[in-house]
Amino acid sequence: MAEQDLLKTLGQLITEQRNPNSMQIDTLSAYEIVQIINNEDKQVPLAIEKVLPQIAQAVEKIVEAFQQGGRLVYIGAGTSGRLGVLDASECPPTFGVSPEMVKGIIAGGERALRHPIEGAEDNKEAGKQDLQAVEFSPKDVLVGIAASGRTPYVLGALAYAKELGAITVSIASNPNSAMSQIADIVIDTVVGAEVLTGSSRMKSGTAQKLVLNMLTTASMILIGKCYQNLMVDVQASNQKLVARAIRIVMQATECSREIAETTLALAENNAKLAIMMILADLDKDGAEQLLSQQQGKISRYTIV
């Protein structure tokens, strides 16, 4: 895009406007500065509340994809890409799923997680190529993330996913963006002008993080990765998580610590399996069979 056209485009974006509440921020005390930032951050959950129906719709499509062997793939550049990678990386330890189930892709690759990669976000073809590199398929769901809603790298990825017939979702902080013209489900978290003009790592990034939390958490809940509000599929891979798994078994079954530890050992540190063993008074094999019959959802057994 020519420089003059880019200047005009940026001038029309809400995220590039000057915030009247922070015009004199460079003359304020530390407390006054953080107070302004905090007050602006309060706008984020209010903006998200307005798009909860679209977020729920995206969750339903993600669940359908998971149930059919598909994946959730995030793609973005800069802060947006980093947040996608972060959310994806938390899913295996939290929900006990394969790292392939939720993937995060950032423009410029692994190095871009820590260092800016010049021109990476401007490469539209690279978005397509990076999806091809992970063998993105029509069974998958693509979530494109960009505060501006116009990042070429993300647009290229969305267009390719759309061409394949996959479900596409856009997350942006500007309404009626180029991304929204492609995506099947449009999530526009319009948080307003940033405290520092154009610094979309702030309110826009916070909104993205909250939405991504919702997408994965709600989807995992719906496919049975929790019981009540307990992370029963947590991977007990360190001392803290082993202790958490013991507490989860105790809380879910109201059993003693001794019973929880013993049953967890028999269940090979699988908290969900240990819970089912205790609730149904079954051995490991019997509990595994029952969980399979209930599609991995403990609540289907306890509610009956």
From Swiss-Prot:
The active site is at E90 (proton donor), E121. The keyword Lyase applies. Pathway: Amino-sugar metabolism; 1,6-anhydro-N-acetylmuramate degradation; Amino-sugar metabolism; N-acetylmuramate degradation; Cell wall biogenesis; peptidoglycan recycling. It catalyses: N-acetyl-D-muramate 6-phosphate + H2O = N-acetyl-D-glucosamine 6-phosphate + (R)-lactate. Residues 62-225 form the SIS domain. CDD domains: SIS_Etherase (cd05007). Pfam families: GKRP-like_C (PF20741), GKRP_SIS_N (PF22645). It is an enzyme of class 4 (lyase). Gene3D superfamilies: 1.10.8.1080, Glucose-6-phosphate isomerase like protein, domain 1. Keywords: Carbohydrate metabolism, Lyase. Its EC number is 4.2.1.126. NCBIfam families: N-acetylmuramic acid 6-phosphate etherase (TIGR00274), PRK05441.1 (NF003915), PRK12570.1 (NF009222). Specifically catalyzes the cleavage of the D-lactyl ether substituent of MurNAc 6-phosphate, producing GlcNAc 6-phosphate and D-lactate. Together with AnmK, is also required for the utilization of anhydro-N-acetylmuramic acid (anhMurNAc) either imported from the medium or derived from its own cell wall murein, and thus plays a role in cell wall recycling. Homodimer. Belongs to the GCKR-like family. MurNAc-6-P etherase subfamily. A lyase-type mechanism (elimination/hydration) is suggested for the cleavage of the lactyl ether bond of MurNAc 6-phosphate, with the formation of an alpha,beta-unsaturated aldehyde intermediate with (E)-stereochemistry, followed by the syn addition of water to give product. This is N-acetylmuramic acid 6-phosphate etherase. It comes from Glaesserella parasuis serovar 5 (strain SH0165) (Haemophilus parasuis). The lineage of its organism: Bacteria, Pseudomonadati, Pseudomonadota, Gammaproteobacteria, Pasteurellales.
